[in-house]
Amino acid sequence: GKYIVFWEEFYKSCQKYFLSDSECVKQYYVFTDVDKIYQEDVDVNIHRFYQEALPWPDIALKRYEIFLKIKDILIRDTDYVFFFNGNSLFLDYIVWPEIAPNEQQGFLLSLSWNCYDDNRKFPYDRNIYSTACIPYGKGNIYYQSGITGGRTREYVNLLQECKEQTDIDYFNKVTAVYHDESHLNKFLLDRKIKVLSTNYGRPEEWETPQYPKMIFRDKYKIFGDEINKMKGIKSRCLFIRFIEKMKRVIQLNLILK
């Protein structure tokens, strides 16, 4: 889809800053519906896979299913896998010890902005009919899905379990509140993993940390209000707030009874 506009700068910055000091071979696996991407005819480590542009929120909900299409390739050709949002941009050098999860961390990593002071404020899915549901009072960290990764075997397991959760919800006509991110948080609940700070994935429009090593570019600068139309953000947010208020009323009534 239209996110392909971010690819060239992502690739250039990744080549320069991400693990550029190590002996690892960086393989790029790009899912897109365009016929050609920057440097694919030059760099043999760029692998483009056709993926039709799905409507929102299917493109998010189907993320794990899409990645698993190349499961055998990942297992055969990689030791570690890292996923970065399409609008990611590296700004400073990131070396292996910073990014590599160890055995004590389950060989998995994810990003957390750590911007909540109370786990009751975590935007977990609270819908008891969703496989992504996390009850109030549970969980210590809320993870952002813009960066995930780990040793290939463990990461493929993450993809498979999250896909299974998503498939069950899809069959039951249930949509997790924040789609793939909600399912990621359910999978990672109470697991010990490597947690990346906002320094490794700061929204471009934020002012702190002042010198991040990687940012998520502001999509509104590129797409403007069109991004709202793509996601139906206004109506969806109003609906979510309404549902959350109704849940609180129901829970309060149950307590009073």
Regions found by a protein language model. Name each.
Residues 1-59, 70-77, 239-257:
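N-terminal anchoring/stem segment of glycosyltransferases
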Residues 1-2, 35-37, 53-54, 88-90, ...:
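Short, solvent-exposed loop/turn segments at secondary-structure junctions
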Residues 41-54, 64, 98-109, 211-215:
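Active-site regions of enzymes building and remodeling cell-envelope glycoconjugates
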Residues 51-84, 92, 179-184:
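A conserved donor-nucleotide-binding helix/loop in the catalytic core
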Residues 90-127:
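Conserved donor-nucleotide/metal-binding helix-loop-beta segment in metal-dependent transferases, i.e.
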Residues 131-220:
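Catalytic core and acceptor-binding pocket of nucleotide-sugar-dependent glycosyltransferases
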Residues 214-257:
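Long, low-complexity C-terminal extensions of enzymes
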